[in-house]
Regions:
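C-terminal helical/coil "lid" or tail adjacent to the Rossmann-like core of SAM-dependent
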Residues: 2-31, 231-289
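A short acidic, Gly/Pro-enriched loop at the edge of an enzyme's catalytic core
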Residues: 113-125
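Conserved alpha-helix/loop element of class I SAM-dependent methyltransferases that forms part
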Residues: 34-53, 68
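Short alpha-helix
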Residues: 212-227
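Conserved class I S-adenosyl-L-methionine
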Residues: 156-195
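A short SAM/SAH-binding and catalytic strip from SAM-dependent methyltransferases
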Residues: 124-139, 161
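Class I SAM-dependent methyltransferase SAM/SAH-binding core
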Residues: 54-58, 62-115
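A short glycine-rich, Lys/Arg-flanked "PGG" loop and its adjoining helix->strand segment in the class I
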Residues: 139-154
Length: 308
């Protein structure tokens, strides 16, 4: 899921994938694996892979999609794994060796919008899982996908839709601004806004400038259409579920995406000691009760490059 050169520190991706996604807790990492594998499997369902094909897994991260593709198709599948993070590519290459599939894999360090080293019309399928969301110029990335695909080739994408999270941060900001000094009667509300605003844009201007928030499933569909793809099918999945985070300590150390600091950093940098106590007194019982809910929004899209 690591892709764009918009942020100067490419290793932010490895820090998130190998640590912040699961709060540095190996048990929690294992607990969320089935959910991650379900995302990958749905991408592969849309990929329609067959024997003797070449798959380009863009922003491969740990190689989850790539390795599950090999498990499905077998030894005739060749996979090109790309990532902007050299750390993640090394990690994925090590996993490929452990799984005995290194000979089926080619590793390419590049961004999703600059697929250097992959020739024109050289792959049958392009997959992404949480990749385009982080690319500033999604049209350029899609044109690269189109370039490397053979005529009749497919894209199968799974992208998080985080625009509603940004809209919620904007709503919190408006509430705090409208209440002004009256917010003193509700000391938690400004802290809630501060937390969310550190992880998602909280003004229309910030949303417009943010790759993760300035697009929706509809604009994603239209971008794919304008890029020349046809037979486009998109499904938006919105799921309200109980939070899987099992403890306050893990809650503090996780973050929702690679560009978001964990709550522990936000509280240390932006809250006073008194505010940290107020926030924990309010939030910790909810987290530890197991009653907290989370909403996930994912767009699954597949499309075909025309033969002519």
């Amino acid at each position: 899921m690591t892709v764009s050169r918009d942020h100067s520190d490419s290793d932010e991706w490895s820090r998130w994938l190998l640590n912040l996604r699961h709060g540095g807790d190996p048990t929690f990492d294992r607990a969320i694996r089935p959910e991650l594998e379900a995302y990958a499997d749905r991408v592969l369902d849309g990929a329609e892979l067959k024997t003797d094909m070449t798959l380009a897994d863009i922003g491969t991260g740990e190689g989850l999609v790539a390795f599950r593709a090999i498990d499905r198709v077998g030894p005739s599948l060749h996979v090109v794994l790309t990532d902007i993070s050299a750390t993640m590519l090394r990690h994925a290459e090590g996993l490929a060796s452990e799984r005995g599939v290194r000979q089926q894999c080619t590793f390419v360090e590049c961004a999703a919008d600059e697929l250097t080293g992959i020739p024109d019309t050289s792959v049958d399928v392009v997959t992404t899982r949480a990749v385009l969301a982080y690319v500033a110029n999604k049209a350029v990335a899609l044109s690269e996908f189109y370039r490397i695909l053979k005529p009749g080739g497919r894209i199968s994408l799974a992208e998080p839709i985080m625009q509603d999270d940004a809209f919620a941060a904007c709503a919190l900001k408006r509430m705090v601004d409208e209440r002004g000094t009256q917010s003193a009667g509700d000391p938690f509300l400004p802290l809630l806004h501060r937390w969310k605003a550190a992880q998602f844009p909280d003004t229309p201007e910030k949303i417009a400038a943010s790759p993760i928030a300035n697009f929706s499933e509809r604009t994603l569909f239209e971008s794919v259409r304008v890029s020349g793809f046809r037979q486009i099918h998109l499904e938006l999945h919105i799921d309200l579920r109980p939070s899987t985070i099992p403890s306050w300590s893990i809650f503090l150390e996780t973050s929702p995406h690679p560009w978001a600091p964990p709550l522990s950093t936000i509280m240390a940098d932006l809250f006073s000691p008194e505010e940290r106590q107020t926030f924990e007194t309010t939030m910790r019982p909810l987290v530890e009760s197991g009653q907290a809910l989370t909403t996930g929004r994912t767009a699954y899209l597949n499309a075909v490059k025309p033969v002519t």
